[in-house]
UniProtKB/Swiss-Prot annotation:
Belongs to the small GTPase superfamily. Ras family. Keywords: Cell membrane, GTP-binding, Hydrolase, Lipoprotein, Membrane, Methylation, Nucleotide-binding, Palmitate, Prenylation. It is a lipid-anchor. Its EC number is 3.6.5.2. This is Ras-like protein 1. The modification Cysteine methyl ester is found at residue 285. Alternates between an inactive form bound to GDP and an active form bound to GTP. Activated by a guanine nucleotide-exchange factor (GEF) and inactivated by a GTPase-activating protein (GAP). A lipid is attached at residue 284 (S-palmitoyl cysteine). It comes from the Eukaryota. InterPro entries: P-loop_NTPase, Small_GTP-bd, Small_GTPase, Small_GTPase_Ras-type. The keyword Hydrolase applies. Pfam families: Ras (PF00071). GO terms for cellular component: plasma membrane.
Length: 288
């Protein structure tokens, strides 16, 4: 399917907008002036080895058609701003046309091309080539002088506008691509930060679990410090030698405690007998 370009020809009355358009489409010059309200023309052509379809809208230059012109401007992709080199007034009008385009398109950058028409009327020139070029530079767009009568730079003007549209679209696409890449980079950076934060949280959680496990192990092993001191709750009841064996199983500790109980009972009995003997000696009496 052919790429279609919607071109709008804008300028004051009598500058040769229709003559330029008809010369491009039909390759002949219209000598008489017939004020245009709206004419649309289509032409298939080859530009830079690409088959394209030009949809050219020739608009009215009269001020009374300003509202209608705004409607045409909304649909246009690119604009030919045409003045006549033998009319200073038509040259000065281009500023208002350009401002109207920017306002309607709601943009500060629109594909346009400034055309100084009727360059065959050199003896009647009122606008110098340098002034036309300076105006185009202020619009940041190309500039050509044309002659619809002598078919000078007619195709170049329309084709140049198409190239300007392509350059404009390429810049827009590049800007959108860069913006998308920046957004992707920001998302990647944010994802990396989230992963790093999650990793730190996991490490902290593992560390806390390890501390809790160590505390639980100490409680199970009798609550004894490294020097064999029983904890404040009196748990454990084991000697310092047992405290140095934190990895003993519970059954082993019970066996050791059972072995110590008979020995402790014998010691208690011996201590009781000794105390009874002492009391007998101290409690004897003498009969007189």
């Amino acid at each position: 399917m052919l790429r279609e370009y919607k071109l709008v020809v804008v300028g004051g009355g009598g500058v040769g907008k229709s003559a330029l358009t008809i010369q491009l489409i039909q390759s002949h010059f219209v000598d008489e002036y017939d004020p245009t309200i709206e004419d649309s023309y289509r032409k298939q052509c080859t530009i830079d080895d690409q088959q394209v379809l030009l949809d050219v809208l020739d608009t009215a230059g009269q001020e009374e058609y300003s509202a209608m012109r705004e409607q045409y401007m909304r649909t246009g992709e690119g604009f030919l701003l045409v003045y006549s080199i033998n009319s200073l007034n038509s040259f000065q009008e281009l500023n208002s046309f350009y401002d109207q385009i920017l306002r309607v398109k709601d943009s500060d950058n629109v594909p346009v091309l400034v055309v100084g028409n009727k360059c065959d009327l050199e003896m009647e020139r009122q606008v110098s080539y340098e002034d036309g070029l300076a105006l185009a530079n202020s619009f940041n767009c190309p500039f050509l002088e044309t002659s619809a009568k002598q078919r000078i730079n007619v195709e170049e003007a329309f084709y140049g506008l198409v190239r300007n549209i392509n350059q404009y679209n390429a810049k827009i696409a590049e800007a959108e691509k860069q913006q998308q890449q920046q957004q992707q980079q920001q998302n990647a950076n944010q994802q990396g930060q989230d992963q790093y934060g999650q990793q730190k949280d996991n490490q902290q959680s593992q560390f806390n679990n390890q501390i809790n496990n160590n505390n639980n192990t100490s409680a199970v092993n009798g609550g004894v410090s490294s020097d064999g001191i029983i904890d404040q709750n009196g748990n454990g009841g084991v000697s310092s030698g047992q405290a140095n064996l934190p990895n003993q199983s519970q059954s082993q500790r019970q066996q050791q405690q059972q072995q110590q109980e008979p020995q402790q009972q014998s010691e208690n009995q011996f201590s009781g007998q000794k105390q009874s003997s002492s009391k007998s000696k101290n409690g004897c009496c003498v009969i007189v």
